[in-house]
């Protein structure tokens, strides 16, 4: 793994749904991936992972050891439902408790990076107070993460509050903590009116991982690779030339497709071809 030029992973929701991580990691290995990113979203099913028993956590660790496929990151989107910026104190308290549990879970199973959703609120109307509460919630969260030695990394979002690396860097400077970094999504970054290459360059030194997906203005999910606006080759070239050597994660939602594995193989081949054109990997 450490000798590989590009660590390439796949999002959990791209693979067949289910709770058997040994099967999921075996499939990811068969498909040629180095790691899988876990999802803890706003559904009760995935939120319940944060309450796994010691034995369930150990089963995940054993699956990682057996397959050699890592689970180094968690996409924590549960804060859509329980936002840190909520003006409802009970909801906000639940959001902070989810953060505490996620950090503890990460510490237990070896997850190094928790990707945060940059929403002060999602289903409610945002205002100055929701943004203040969000900032304060991030500060408290980063203090917890620091004690656990787990990195919190902000995603560039489908939401105006955090739709550019420049905006996320403002939070990084505000928090001024090495355990808070950036996890840009080149699809989301490209769907807004951003100078994408300048934004990527600005984030170097703070980027710990990169989400890879295609998008269109106003359409942030399920855009087939090659049918959106993302200039993948230029993004990959910029990241390489800027010195980024970290992981890339193909983000897909094909878990309910007729043949998820076939969808993933098709997407992976497409992405690798663009990486090859950018000089990142050898052409197949």
UniProtKB/Swiss-Prot annotation:
Pathway: Cofactor degradation; L-ascorbate degradation; D-xylulose 5-phosphate from L-ascorbate: step 3/4. This is L-ribulose-5-phosphate 3-epimerase UlaE. Transmembrane segments: none annotated. It comes from Shigella flexneri. It catalyses: L-ribulose 5-phosphate = L-xylulose 5-phosphate. It holds the Pfam family AP_endonuc_2. The gene is ulaE. Induction: Induced by L-ascorbate. Repressed by UlaR. NCBIfam families: hxl6Piso_put, PRK13209.1, PRK13210.1. InterPro entries: L-Ru-5P_3-Epase, L-Ru-5P_3-Epase_Enterobacteria, Sugar_Epim/Isomerase, Xyl_isomerase-like_sf, Xyl_isomerase-like_TIM-brl.
């Amino acid at each position: 793994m450490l000798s590989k030029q590009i660590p390439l992973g796949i999002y959990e929701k791209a693979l067949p749904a289910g709770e058997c991580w040994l099967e999921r990691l075996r499939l990811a290995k068969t498909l040629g991936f180095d790691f899988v990113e876990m999802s803890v979203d706003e559904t009760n099913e995935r939120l319940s992972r944060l309450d796994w028993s010691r034995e369930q956590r150990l089963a995940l660790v054993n699956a990682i050891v057996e397959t050699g496929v890592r689970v180094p990151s968690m996409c924590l989107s549960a804060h859509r439902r329980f936002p840190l910026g909520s003006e409802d104190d009970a909801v906000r308290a639940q959001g902070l408790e989810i953060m505490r549990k996620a950090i503890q879970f990460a510490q237990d199973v070896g997850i190094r990076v928790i990707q945060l959703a940059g929403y002060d609120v999602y289903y409610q109307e945002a205002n100055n107070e929701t943004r203040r509460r969000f900032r304060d919630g991030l500060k408290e969260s980063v203090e917890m993460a620091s004690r656990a030695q787990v990195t919190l990394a902000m995603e560039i979002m489908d939401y105006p509050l955090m739709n550019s690396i420049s905006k996320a860097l403002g939070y990084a400077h505000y928090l001024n903590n090495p355990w808070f970094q950036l996890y840009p999504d080149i699809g989301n970054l490209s769907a807004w009116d951003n100078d994408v290459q300048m934004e990527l360059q600005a984030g170097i030194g703070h980027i710990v991982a990169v989400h890879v997906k295609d998008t269109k203005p106003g359409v942030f999910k399920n855009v087939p690779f090659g049918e959106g606006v993302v200039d993948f080759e230029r993004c990959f070239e910029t990241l390489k030339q800027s010195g980024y050597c970290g992981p890339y994660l193909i983000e897909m939602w094909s878990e309910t497709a007729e043949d998820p594995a076939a969808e993933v193989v098709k997407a992976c081949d497409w992405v690798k071809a663009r990486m090859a054109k950018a000089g990142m990997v050898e052409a197949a």
